[in-house]
A protein has these predicted regions:
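Conserved N-terminal entry element of GNAT/NAT acetyltransferase domains
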Residues: 2-29
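Acetyl-CoA-dependent GNAT
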Residues: 25-91, 96, 101, 114, ...
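Conserved functional loop/turn residues at catalytic and ligand-binding sites
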Residues: 61, 97-99, 103-104, 108, ...
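Conserved acetyl-CoA-binding loop-helix of GNAT-fold acetyltransferases
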Residues: 100, 106-119, 142, 146
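Conserved GNAT acetyl-CoA-binding A-motif
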Residues: 114, 121-133
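Conserved beta-strand-loop-alpha-helix junction that forms the acyl-donor binding cleft
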Residues: 131-140, 159, 163
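Conserved acetyl-CoA-binding loop of GNAT-fold acetyltransferases
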Residues: 145-154
Length: 163
């Protein structure tokens, strides 16, 4: 990953042009940048944390992680999808996470990553993609609705943490 100052310089250059992203599978070397992007959405973690998680996901054929990389080599965003298998429903793809760098939002990177996820679902013969979005993320809701997703329910989430 480029140093912070070099990354800022590259972002300034890219921001002045239409954004083109190349979608590729995430690699272990991307962990630091993926962690940085996750922090922009309030999910802090270290590069080491991300490497540990990424190692497991990349080894599982029912999970995929892709990055959207600009022409200058900046990872503008990432998406994690997985096959969700439940007893009560047919399997579908769930978007576990989608993060676009705040400097690149609204320029099409998210759309391209979601389209990649949808293609992955169709290639597996699955008929739907499911995504959860925090009730306060109104921009994300508008983004998904613009792509044809519809709100199917609201719910509360619960967690019990074991020390």
């Amino acid at each position: 990953m480029a140093g912070t100052e070099e990354l800022k310089r590259k972002i300034r250059v890219v921001k002045g042009r239409p954004l083109k992203v190349n979608i590729r599978a995430a690699q272990m070397e991307d962990a630091g940048r993926l962690a940085e992007l996750s922090g922009q959405l309030g999910y802090p973690g270290s590069a080491g944390d991300m490497r540990r998680r990424l190692r497991h996901l990349l080894a599982d054929p029912e999970h995929a992680v892709w990055v959207g990389e600009t022409e200058s080599g900046i990872i503008a965003g990432w998406i994690h999808v997985f096959v969700k298998r439940l007893l009560e429903n047919d399997p579908e793809i769930e978007i576990g996470g989608l993060v676009i760098d705040e400097n690149f939002r609204g320029q099409g990177a998210g759309k391209v990553l979601v389209e990649r996820a949808e293609g992955w679902a169709k290639a597996r013969g699955l008929k739907s993609v499911y995504v959860r979005s925090n009730v306060v993320r109104n921009d994300a809701h508008a983004f998904y609705q613009k792509l044809g997703y519809r709100i199917i329910k609201t719910q509360s989430s619960f967690r019990k943490t074991f020390c």
